[in-house]
């Protein structure tokens, strides 16, 4: 299988490397990175030309421009999968902008750690095809709907809880430190949710604060679209923005 990977940051480069290790022919494109172990194209059109599957793993802010940039270079049978954390509306816009089958894919794990084995949700016209291609390569794919945006929406709703929980832990422990009881409060929280989860919430928030600001803003916008006031999502975005500036 020939796979083009657009975006070779932490997530994209790890997935590209895993695909190459699994026997796929991988061509990558990133204007700022050229990792070893895969073929690096000179431009995005060269990366996608002739590919069976295109994986867009750049960023929600550039996903639509990236799709439009390569649209005319795609083969009729190419499957275009967008793996960025984005709003359901953006996923629908991507599907409309592309002349090929589209899959909305939402990754719900820590990609730099688990790579191709990261749990994925998929929706859209190309979801079943995506699952059929990537499950044999080790990716656990759960097809959740036929509409682009269904997978993205589920991830964002999950993120309201997970990132909201992380924000609550960060705020609680910051206050506990100011009060001189950080160790006690840390132990109390860990006794409820487990030390492993607590450490993952704290370390992940610090390491990925900037990216998660965009995620929580997208979640807040989605809640508003659903008629729900995004109190927790908005507060989590604000806290993460402060954290990203430190």
Report each predicted region and the residues it spans:
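Helical "substrate-binding/catalytic lid" subdomain
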Residues: 154-246
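Short, well-ordered alpha-helix to beta-strand connector turns
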Residues: 23, 38, 51, 77, ...
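The conserved SAM/SAH-binding core of class I Rossmann-like methyltransferase domains
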Residues: 6, 29, 56-57, 105
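Hydrophobic anchor at the start of a short beta-strand
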Residues: 3, 26-27, 102, 141, ...
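NAD(P)+-binding Rossmann beta1-loop-alpha1 motif at the extreme N-terminus of oxidoreductases
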Residues: 1-50
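Rossmann-fold dinucleotide-binding core
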Residues: 63, 86-160
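Rossmann-fold NAD(P) dinucleotide-binding segment
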Residues: 44-101
């Amino acid at each position: 299988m020939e796979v083009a990977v657009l975006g070779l940051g932490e997530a994209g480069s790890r997935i590209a490397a895993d695909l190459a290790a699994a026997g796929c022919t991988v061509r990558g494109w990133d204007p700022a990175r050229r990792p070893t172990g895969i073929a690096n194209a000179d431009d995005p059109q060269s990366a996608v030309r002739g590919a069976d599957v295109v994986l867009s793993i750049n960023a929600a802010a550039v996903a639509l421009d990236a799709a439009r940039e390569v649209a005319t270079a795609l083969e009729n049978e190419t499957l275009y999968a967008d793996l960025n954390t984005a709003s359901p509306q953006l996923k629908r816009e991507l599907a409309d902008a592309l002349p090929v089958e589209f899959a909305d894919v939402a990754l719900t794990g820590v990609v730099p750690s688990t790579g191709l084995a990261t749990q994925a949700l998929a929706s859209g016209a190309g979801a079943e095809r995506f699952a059929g291609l990537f499950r044999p390569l080790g990716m656990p794919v759960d097809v959740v709907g036929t509409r682009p945006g269904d997978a993205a929406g589920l991830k964002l709703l999950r993120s309201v809880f997970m990132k909201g929980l992380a924000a609550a832990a960060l705020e609680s422990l910051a206050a506990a430190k100011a009060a001189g009881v950080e160790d006690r409060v840390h132990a109390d929280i860990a006794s409820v949710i487990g030390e492993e989860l607590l450490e993952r919430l704290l370390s992940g928030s610090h390491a990925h604060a900037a990216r998660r600001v965009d995620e929580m803003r997208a979640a807040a916008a989605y809640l508003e679209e659903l008629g729900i006031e995004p109190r927790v999502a908005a507060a989590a975005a604000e806290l993460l923005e402060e954290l990203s500036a430190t």
